[in-house]
Design a protein with these regions (language model features):
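Glycine/serine-rich anion-binding loops at beta->alpha junctions
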Residues: 1-12
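Alpha-helix N-cap/helix-start motif
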Residues: 6, 73-77, 120-121
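Acidic beta-strand-loop-alpha-helix segment within the catalytic core
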Residues: 14-100, 147-166
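Conserved S/T- and glycine-rich ATP-binding loop of Class I adenylate-forming
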Residues: 1, 64, 128
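PAS-family sensory domains
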Residues: 13-14, 134
Length: 166
């Protein structure tokens, strides 16, 4: 990944176990800082300690992460992203797969990204969902094949974000 090549610490090794094409177990190993996130139905752990997302039902209270603004290729995508980014409490650039781990741990509340491949996201789905979060495509559809992704630690926040992104 770009983060690994450039020496940033936000990269990770992603492994997903699929059942009938759906991710049922996900692992993200971040060897630089010695963290391993593992997610299955109803549970996500960091080095064996259970994680939960943070309750944050409104955009104005949310901490948003995105890897890079260049993920938004069209004016419509940039406008949709900006309609959310302009309302959140904090916006953090960078993060790559680590953004989803931070969401599962309750440090950030929302991740919005674009043009992801299946191998970019499949391991992160059980990690987000196991910690209590919601993850989908921008239109609310399942994300398993990659695409334009929105993940939130709170279902109400996810619904509000999807309404802006559709």
């Amino acid at each position: 990944t770009k983060a690994f090549i450039t020496g940033f610490t936000t990269w990770g090794t992603l492994i997903a176990l699929l059942k009938n094409g759906d991710p049922v177990l996900g692992a993200m190993n971040q060897p630089f800082v010695g963290e391993r996130f593992v997610g299955v139905a109803g549970q996500t752990t960091l080095n064996g300690q259970q994680l939960r997302t943070r309750a944050c039902p409104r955009l104005e209270q949310a901490r948003l992460g995105i890897t890079e603004l260049e993920m938004m290729h069209t004016d419509a995508q940039r406008d949709a992203f900006e309609s959310i980014a302009s309302r959140v409490e904090y916006l953090r650039l960078g993060g790559d797969c680590y953004n989803y781990a931070l969401l599962a741990a309750g440090h950030i509340d929302l991740v919005i990204e674009g043009d992801l491949m299946p191998w970019d996201i499949q391991a992160l789905i059980p990690i987000v969902e196991g910690a209590g979060g919601v993850i989908s495509l921008w239109d609310g559809a399942p994300v398993h094949g990659g695409g334009w992704v929105v993940a939130a630690g709170d279902a109400a926040l996810h619904a509000e974000a999807v309404a802006h992104l559709k």
